[in-house]
Amino acid sequence: MCGIVGAVAQRNVSQILLEGLSRLEYRGYDSAGICTIDNNTLNCIKTTGKVKNLKEAVKEKGCPGSIGIAHTRWATHGIPSEVNAHPHICDNLALVHNGIIENFAEIKEQLIAQGYKFKSQTDTEVLVCLIHYHLQKSSSLLEAFKSALNEVKGSFGLALIDKNDPNTLYAARSGSPLIIGLGIGENFIASDTLALLPVTRRFIFLEEGEIAVLTTESIKVYDLDGNELHKDIVESDMDAESISKGPYRHYMQKEIYEQPQSLQNTLLGRLRGDDISLETVVGIDENTFKDIDSIQIVACGTSYHAGLVGRYWLEALTGISTNVEIASEYRYRKAVVRKNSLFVTISQSGETADTLASLRLAKEQNYKKSLCICNVNGSSLVRESDFTLFTKAGAEIGVASTKAFTTQLLSLLILALIIGKQKGTISKEQNHEIIEDIRKLPALAQEFLDCDKEISLLSEQFSGKHHCLFLGRGVMFPIALEGALKLKEISYIHAEGYAAGELKHGPIALIDKEMPVVVVAPDNSLMDKLVSNIEEVRARGALLYIFVSEQAHLKEDRQTRKVSLPDCPEILQPILFTIPLQLLAYHCAVINGTDVDQPRNLAKSVTVE
């Protein structure tokens, strides 16, 4: 949510800032702005809508300067408008801000009493005025910056410039991610490494409560008490070209088709004969999980659905009681924590606000250890967890998660095998069989992609539909939830996922001849039960779309469309049956003409609570 880019250089920085914003569009936003300093003057341009609107405005008006900040805004305080867009200016200062200042109304009243006037409805304008207020009483802008930040409550990632000091860029982080990019004779700040890949591969990750001061020749990082800190430099191996669409129409389409390779990357170097390398999970040894007797998984959105699938595998393969909870709910109940409990978080970005807050809460509770399943090395979740299992999905730009989800599932299966082996709950024969099945996964994923053309044609039947029901049983119930989420978030068709056994407990009342019902029906031990649910739907005249294994024998009639999918090992079914549901959502969105990669009101990384 929101994006920040800042630069201090010996060249014009406006194109660097605009390119950085373009690379952050996937995070979700409703307006954008840029501010540079030229001849001790603040040049500020703001627009609503897409970054391309800002680029056109900059091209028309010009925005010179060798130092500047830029921002994409997601409305929290105040409607989307040019007035509310960032940067916000107070006299000589310009500020961009990600996060929420919780006590802004109280501070605003105090500043109004001091004679400050406000143009916008935002908490960010209040913050820049607060910094300006402290500057009048401080010996330096750095001191004023620290004083203001010690006064505010909430979360923030900030970048600040001063027209009276056109060679220095200030930044601070508390709850909202910020990274520093190191160049030669130039330095940068951003909310995501992707924004800076065209200009640097060397990064410093700011931690909670840290302030950075950047010039062309130096970077200094302080805590809020003013103590200078030593920071490690991290070299990124990500390729700037890896985030191009290539021959694909949308990032989502590309990322769906990348799944065979992404799954292969998740396995790379981790399978050794019938064993999984201990190096798969960073930080563990052969005894790490021996005493674990309960597992708590916490995640949001699609990652939560991955956790629900993971529970089936963890309990079946390890015998350990596993609970899964939405992060924003976990934080607000008094959890009963057993002595030898493992706390597991799942997040693609590693910056999801509620998931991070849950991890920090867990550290105050009685958990033995914490483990994160994450796609981004160096993210806050990775740095703050005891152990990490990297999904290695590669950059995912589309807001709707695809390859990140399937690699999360594979990572959870791998984790279950590692814990099961340490606990002695998996026989050698079972371990061998599962690992042999896992080796087939990338090739099977490619086979499942071969149904794309059929699903593209099928999706035309969803045109004009306003509601849809997804049904699944057992481990496929979370996949039904995920299928419904994908459809609703990118095609804007209202969709709900239900456990098929719950059909008679409410959702059957909604079924009529106009409602598509999607059934996830792999050939497994629950097929007979699922067939009964299918017949109940059929009897009420609904439009049935059944995603089924080739070897399963289900009848097809005028109201039923069957999509036959390749046979696959039962333990891999949740991963593989996800792929056709992703394709269905994608093609429905294309037909409906929605913004597939940046659906309305959604953000890739939810970094505010």
Feature-to-residue mapping (PLM):
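Active-site phosphate/pyrophosphate-binding segments
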Residues: Q259-L263, L267-Q296, N377, F387-P516, ...
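Conserved short alpha-helical segments that host acidic/polar catalytic motifs at enzyme active sites
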Residues: M1-K245, R249, Q264-D293, Y332, ...
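Glycine-rich oxoanion-binding loops at beta->alpha junctions
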Residues: G49, S66-V83, D274-E286, G310-I346, ...
